[in-house]
Amino acid sequence: MSASSSDDFLQLVSGTKIMFGSLPLTHRYGGHQFGSWAGQLGDGRAHLIGIYTNRFGSRWELQLKGSGRTPYSRRGDGRAVLRSSIREFLGSEAMHYLGIPTSRAASLVVSDDNIWRDQFYNGNIKKERGAIVLRVAKSWFRIGSLEILAQSGELDLLRMLLDMVIKEHFPKININDSNKYLAFFSQVVSETAHLIGLWMSVGFAHDYGPFGFMDSYNPDFVPNTSDDEGRYKIGNQANVGMFNLNKLLKALNPLFSPRQKQLAAQILEGYPQQYYKGFVELFKTKLGLLGENEDDDYLIAFLLKLMEDSRADFTMTFRQLSEISEDKLKDLNIPKEFWALQDIAKHKNFSTWIAMYLLRLKGNVGDSDSERRRRMSSVNPRYVLRNWMAESAVQKAEINDFSEVRFLQQVFQHPFLVQTLAERAGYAQHPPTWAEDVKVSCSS
């Protein structure tokens, strides 16, 4: 019997047994919801049960989500439903194998107990199956962990917590440096710009509750039915990042000298440029462009506008550009299996963009068509976790059939490789007609 099927392991990942020497704890954090300060938010249903260091020296914090009430549960029951737990389990793993920094999911345990939820906040309360996810991350601290202390005037605790975070998770920062908090802020700004750029490069709208990968390209894509005004639409993610960093700066300001406050404000002012520069570089890579050209940002914007106008599939447009030869593009000879390119090829300006693109590819010194396609296929996934895939897996899991959950988990371990079974399942084809009806919400 493997360790993962032992009773001790099952009790551990279901939260019914505590590891020897473990002292479970929960984070206290606050935050903003839809732009307004909401006060203390959690952790209302997550327990940190230990820290694990693997054989490579990487340190991981182990956390159970959906494991019951905490001192910060407010009016919640501390539980999580199966549908949202499956989505987080698959979503975080899919992001990891796409090469995007993320928390990971180590296990998913289904409870025998049912819990009450109003999934779409429309008064339709029903029983749903509960679940617990064991998830891991380098750290579970967040901006709200610092905000709550600054908001309540607990500056000594704020300083202590920040020193610990820097010491444990920002080893390049000298803990004795008088500018350590400024260096911390600068690194968080840079990493935030980079992370959101990575999300955009795969068409991902955050977070692991009501998240979504775009089907048709649409900068107004909002996977969350609770977001009536589109605050968190995919095209606004960089702006929300700026908002969050503003709140982090506000939390850190009591620890800064007047000069440090000025420098921190300048660092924040540089965020939009950092983000946009990274965004352009990521999309240049997706298009197989080498070197520098002053018109690259226009070439990218032109393509995205064509995709928006023609409702072209985001993932497969870039993937099929990775697979088609330059000769076929030059002749506008789009085979029927390149269905996403056929959709965008109907646009009256597609031939103009193709001519610009092929001319730009000629500037790839020492490159070849086969090398371009190889390079592009290594960064443009063929499979992403579309909401209809997750919904199909959830519906089967609700009746104790977890085969599709396991299958998707396997598929997303190799998102850039053509997989026979994934092709048969239609994961690289036009989404089914019912996919447009899939809705997700904050309810979990």
Q: Where are the language model's segments positioned?
A:
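Acidic side chains
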Residues: 77-78, 207, 313, 401
